[in-house]
């Protein structure tokens, strides 16, 4: 349910059921005869989100402001089946529930015809419990991926239940719809999972 609050603001209530399936190896050393670990996570989620957005583009904006606050409750049942390279030997089942708080702010403090300077920050607080193994836990966590290309990779260093990322967007507009961008970010996980080998 979306509800407009002003010209650039909206409030959204969302309830959904989900069925997530992940096939993965817990090691880099595997052959074509090995079988993957398999984890399913079935459940439901409810969230409330407030967004104020006056950015001029959906991606790679160079003008405007963005503010997002999202609170999400997740409940579900995990079922993990170990593969041939897994240190676990038996199937695992566990109930999970957690709250996820996400805050994101972006503001272009200098906005000229040829030069734009923006500040961008994102913070996540997540009370997610551990899944049956390291990889399954990370796959279920929120990732820090402000660049769309990062969504296509599994980068464990940028997955953490509690983290903050902040950066500076330096943009030179050569002509309309053609920018040269230098985006620099700092990522700080407050809680990070370490794999024990």
Model-derived segments and spans:
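C-terminal outer-membrane beta-barrel translocator/porin domains of Gram-negative envelope proteins
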Residues: 43-175, 179-182, 192-194
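An acidic/polar, Gly/Ser/Thr-rich interaction patch typically located in mid-to-C-terminal regions
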Residues: 185-186
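Transmembrane beta-barrel wall of Gram-negative outer-membrane proteins
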Residues: 1-35
